[in-house]
Regions:
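Conserved beta-strand hairpin/beta-sheet module of binuclear metal-dependent hydrolase folds
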Residues: 16-67, 171-189, 206
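Metallo-beta-lactamase
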Residues: 106-171, 259-271
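Active-site neighborhood of phospho(di)ester-bond hydrolases with catalytic His/Asp-centered motifs
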Residues: 54-57, 75-81, 85, 89, ...
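Active-site-proximal loop/helix segment associated with metal-binding centers of metalloenzymes
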Residues: 36-38, 116, 139-202, 206-213
Length: 272
């Protein structure tokens, strides 16, 4: 087990429920693939209650549109780390919000939650990608937040950011999301097995876990199927949802075969 930093039932496809006394939360998985976008999968992307977006992959705009979601409706963007498949869509997201907003006279503010240095990195992407087009959006309609925990205003959610085991140069982190009803979702970002995830999983209803590599790859930076199975066995109370998948989708013919996982583990597909 690596040191880091160096159960709720599923309703239909994507409605995550706590116990009967809790409110319903909607989680849309707009993409479930790893950085290689395996056949039938776009880059991993999750949207909570239509307002909280976790990461911004290069294809974020078609992913949102396919789900019938307007980029202007996103209130909060949570960045897990700096890898391109998690951040290179940021200029496109901002471009749409700035120039194709339903009401350009009432363009909305986006709260971006990152680690220190995020403002500089993401602003540079915008300057290189669309010079002269996004300066006002970055200055006037983007709120930058480097706090490690806080309230996601207007959503009913709060968050706690924590370090995970991934490529150190990307400053990798996950997010523990707590709803006002008590429902807890642990989004682990990109990470291999690590103590920070283990400790938080014990008190989480739902765990969104990546499975970025096949079993013949033993990497400290990603989970493989065997490690996902072991994780689920250690935390039988939690609903384990698998994303950032190395394998093809069920209806694709090429790419790595979809691994067999126990029924209690939900191996997600795009659109779930």
């Amino acid at each position: 087990m690596n040191e880091c930093g160096e159960g709720a039932p599923l309703e239909a496809k994507h409605q995550v429920l706590g116990p009967p006394t809790r409110d319903m939360a909607e989680v849309l998985f707009l993409g479930t693939g790893n950085a290689f976008s395996p056949p039938g999968r776009m880059h991993a992307l999750a949207l909570i209650d239509g307002a909280v977006l976790i990461d911004s992959p290069p294809t974020v705009l078609p992913q949102l549109r396919r789900a019938g979601v307007s980029p202007s409706d996103i209130q909060h963007l949570l960045i897990t780390h700096w890898h391109a498949d998690h951040t290179f869509g940021f200029p496109f997201l901002l471009l749409d919000r700035e120039w194709l907003a339903p009401d350009r006279d009432a363009r909305k503010t986006l709260s971006v939650h990152t680690r220190p240095g995020g403002r500089e990195r993401l602003s540079k992407l915008c300057e290189v990608g669309f010079p002269g087009s996004l300066e006002d959006a970055l200055r006037e309609r983007t709120v930058w937040n480097e706090d490690e925990s806080g309230i996601l205003k207007g959503t009913g959610w709060s968050y706690d950011r924590f370090p995970v085991s991934h490529t150190p140069e990307t400053d990798p982190h996950g997010y523990k999301l707590i709803h006002g009803s008590g429902l807890t979702i642990l989004h682990c970002g990109d990470s291999g097995p690590c103590q920070e995830i283990e400790e938080r999983a014990r008190e989480s209803d739902v765990v969104i876990l990546e499975m970025g590599v096949p079993d013949f790859v033993d990497s400290p930076h990603h989970h493989n199927p065997s490690q996902v199975i072991s994780f689920s066995a250690r935390h039988p109370h939690a609903m384990v949802l698998v994303t950032h998948n190395f394998s093809r989708s069920l209806d694709s013919d090429s790419g790595f075969e979809v691994p067999e996982l126990p029924d209690e583990i939900h191996q997600l597909n795009d659109g779930d």
